[in-house]
């Protein structure tokens, strides 16, 4: 898939494998470039899978994440963009937090809401290490 600066992390064979895994997953969490690599919203609708389209890579003062599930209305979360360069690991953190909250028995929508709050708190608590896209402040979130 992709990461900061659009560098490709997966070739077409890897994307094909990912497509097979999406059919088994409760939800997938593509960012804007990943959603495009998977064929966009129309292709995802054709696959009949649930996904959370993350808006952190989009432009604008607000971040919008949209949960799309077959047979359900979309659920949208919006929040002011946190201006920081310490965004390394946001996607992995969000996915891991969703999985953790689902494993604790939370319904999907609540798990996503809680995971988004965790990521926002970690962004706000970033320790300021390194140059470029530094790490988030996971340690500050309890």
What do the PLM-derived regions correspond to, one by one?
Residues 109-142:
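Charged C-terminal helix
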Residues 57-58, 91-93, 97, 134, ...:
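Gly/Ser/Thr-rich beta-alpha loop segments that engage phosphate groups in nucleotides
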Residues 3-5:
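Conserved beta-loop-beta/alpha segment of the NTase-like Rossmann-fold superfamily
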Residues 85-108:
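Short, small-residue alpha-helix embedded
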Residues 7-74, 83:
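Conserved phosphate/ATP/ADP-binding segment of small-molecule kinases
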Residues 9, 77, 136:
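Short clusters of hydrophobic/aromatic residues that line enzyme substrate/ligand-binding pockets
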Residues 73-75, 101-115:
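Phosphate-handling active-site elements
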Residues 75-78, 121:
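A structural signal for small-residue-enriched, beta-sheet-centric alpha/beta enzyme cores
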């Amino acid at each position: 898939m992709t990461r900061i600066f659009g560098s490709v992390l997966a070739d077409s064979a890897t994307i094909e494998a990912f497509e097979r895994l999406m059919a088994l997953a409760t939800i997938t969490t593509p960012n804007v470039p990943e959603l495009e690599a998977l064929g966009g919203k129309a292709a995802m609708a054709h696959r009949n899978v649930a996904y959370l389209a993350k808006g952190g890579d989009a432009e604008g003062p607000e971040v919008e994440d949209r949960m799309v599930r077959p047979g359900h209305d979309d659920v949208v979360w919006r929040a002011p963009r946190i201006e920081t360069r310490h965004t390394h690991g946001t996607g992995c953190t969000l996915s891991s937090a969703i999985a953790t909250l689902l494993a604790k028995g939370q319904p999907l929508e609540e798990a996503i809401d809680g995971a988004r709050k965790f990521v926002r708190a970690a962004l706000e608590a970033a320790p300021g290490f390194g140059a470029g896209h530094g790490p988030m402040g996971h340690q500050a979130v309890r």
